[in-house]
Amino acid sequence: MNRKFFFTGIRSPRSSAIMAKAASTRRVPALIVGGGPVGLYASSLLSAYGVPSLLAERAANGKSHPRAHLINTRSMELLRELGVERQIREQTPPMDEWRHFRYCTSVLGTQIAAQDHMAGREWAALSEMTPSPMAHLSQPKLEAILRAEAERRALGGTELLSGYECVSFAQHGGGVTAQLRRVVSPAASASYGARYSAVGTGADADAAPDALTVEADYLLACDGAHSRVRQALGLRLRGPAPLQHFKSVHFVAPALAPLLRERGLEAMLYFCFNRGAVAVLVAHNISQGEWVAQLPFFPGLQDAEALDRAACTAGIAACLGTLPTGHAATPPSPFTTTSSSPSSSSSSSSSGSSASSVTVVPFEVKSIGSWAMSSKVIERLSLGRGGMQVLTTAPPPLPHR
């Protein structure tokens, strides 16, 4: 029996008109929906076994907001087999920069405790058992490496399409037929420019039609924790309600590197606890000044919209602390652990100093996202029929900004 699935909120009269105007058809053994680490790895692996595929990714030039960063040992072994371990190692920071977790009042403040994760017998034993120990590399950088490898391996008939989304798909006895739409609109073109241009590798890639009909033996759903393919199939994620909500703030602070090195305070994670903020700072690359702040907030008690760039900047300042020459109190922020308003005069007076008198390490906020920490497991990865398979890296869910 044929079954057809439509993604809620995608189809519209306008999109249907576009698809009718400029549709094209592809026939491939495998359709990959999603161009993250798993989708790109799948494309390369299929090419290695002589199987052409078509990969469709909604974003045009990848994602710049750092997300996952720790590549575990088994993943590194698989990436070694793919032939990209050297490129990953070349971009991974020195281990001394990320072997510790630190607990502190602020990054430059009082150090409460530190855990060296590479000092125990377990790490020594693991290092003897594998040629490819774990690495620490930001997901956008890993995706760039995997994209280049997928393009290098692409067979005749293999395509890597950026700026395309899967609108619907139908299962039938011979596999799957899917409808893809190019994500292009006047508003998107004005806002993102080339970001949403379609890029392809392989047969007829230069045509970049507005819509594609793809006939495939298999559909690989690699479109992440919020997979619309998975949702359309009715495959649920089982688990409790979100454990915590966060503002994820990408910022750069190159000036931190020498200050941390001269004090021997490098780490991967900094758990910061002070009157201005309680948060975790993730050092993706200390030498390059690449950081992400995970600032918790509480829906229902806080207005997420009010936690804007200024509020996030204040939270980061509180977590970084003061320069070595400063002795002012920690600046307040909307992520304060006290119940009083961080902008009130009582907050400033109780700290003994106003926020303006505090000198912190210079930094620049690049992007802000929101996500919910959850503990969920998909009920099934395969339907066992119709060529449908769900693949995932299982990262913490972080919605598109």
What are these regions (language model features)?
Residues 35-43, 146, 221, 365, ...:
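Conserved mid-domain beta->alpha element of the FAD-binding
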Residues 148, 158, 201-206, 218-337, ...:
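Conserved FAD-binding catalytic core of PHBH/FMO-like flavoproteins
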Residues 134-161, 184-200:
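Helical element adjacent to the flavin cofactor pocket in flavoenzyme catalytic cores
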